[in-house]
Amino acid sequence: IAINELAPRVHNSGHYTIEACHCSQFENHVRAVLGWPLGNPQMVAPAAVMVNLLGTEKTSGQPRGLENALRLAGVRFHVYGKMMSGAGRKMGHITVLGNSVEAAQSIAECAAKEIYFG
């Protein structure tokens, strides 16, 4: 068994649950901590794709290119509010729901190409 990471918190790989599931990882985390029953984690769409938005250089954390990205059907944008960007730094993410992974992936990739920080 190989273990990559243990994270006793919500994790970036589950951010898609904000839009894609009846109950997000964030809500279920709070429910678990409070001893409440967990919510329904089932997806609300047949497919979902989440793409991290990474910085490319040390510059302002201000997102740019949103106008074109948000014109694409179903794109949900999340910015993490970091003041400065850096190469490989996670600055936000986008999520796209769709009828297939391929369709959602295509839209998500197009949207991600439009967004940059600076």
Question: Which sequence ranges carry the predicted segments?
Answer:
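Glycine-rich active-site loop/lid that clamps phosphate-bearing ligands
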Residues: 44-45, 51-85
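Active-site "cap" helix and flanking loop/linker of ATP-utilizing ligase/carboxylase catalytic domains
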Residues: 7-58
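A generic structural signal for well-ordered alpha-helical surface patches
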Residues: 27, 51, 64, 75, ...
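Protein kinase-like catalytic core scaffold
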Residues: 1-5
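Intrinsically disordered, low-complexity acidic/polar segments
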Residues: 13-15, 60, 86, 103
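Generic C-terminus detector
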Residues: 79-118
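Short, low-complexity, polar/charged sequence segments that are solvent-exposed and flexible
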Residues: 22-26, 69-73, 96-99, 113-117
